[in-house]
Amino acid sequence: MKFKYGATLFSGFLGLSAILAACGAKGKFDQVDDGKIVLASSLTSKNAANALQAVVEKYNQVKGGNDYPIEITQITGGYDGGRGNLQTKLSVKDKTTFYNLI
């Protein structure tokens, strides 16, 4: 009974250590702090895009002096275009033109 408990406990720690090793900082990168928040949008509906633009404009008008302004960048191709763009920017570790929110 002790052997089974010990083996189960050991295998749990082994699995946990593998997960922690996979989550290491090897692939990490930081963006350049450019003083703004870039919001990527892949909205295909003009009404939805206009509504998002109105919300961002209102936020930029009422934000505090220490808060970053928000800019919207449009990603073409809908959700598929957004996914492809995100994968590309992550794989090349784009530090300067990468967006902060999607």
From Swiss-Prot:
Keywords: Cell membrane, Lipoprotein, Membrane, Palmitate, Signal
Membrane-topology annotation of the record: Lipid-anchor
Residues bearing a lipid moiety (S-diacylglycerol cysteine): C23
One Gene Ontology cellular component annotation held by this UniProt entry: plasma membrane
Endpoints of the signal sequence: 1-22
Compartments where located: Cell membrane
Keyword Lipoprotein: yes
Similarity comment text for this entry: Belongs to the MG185/MG260 family.
Protein name per its UniProtKB record: Uncharacterized lipoprotein MPN_363
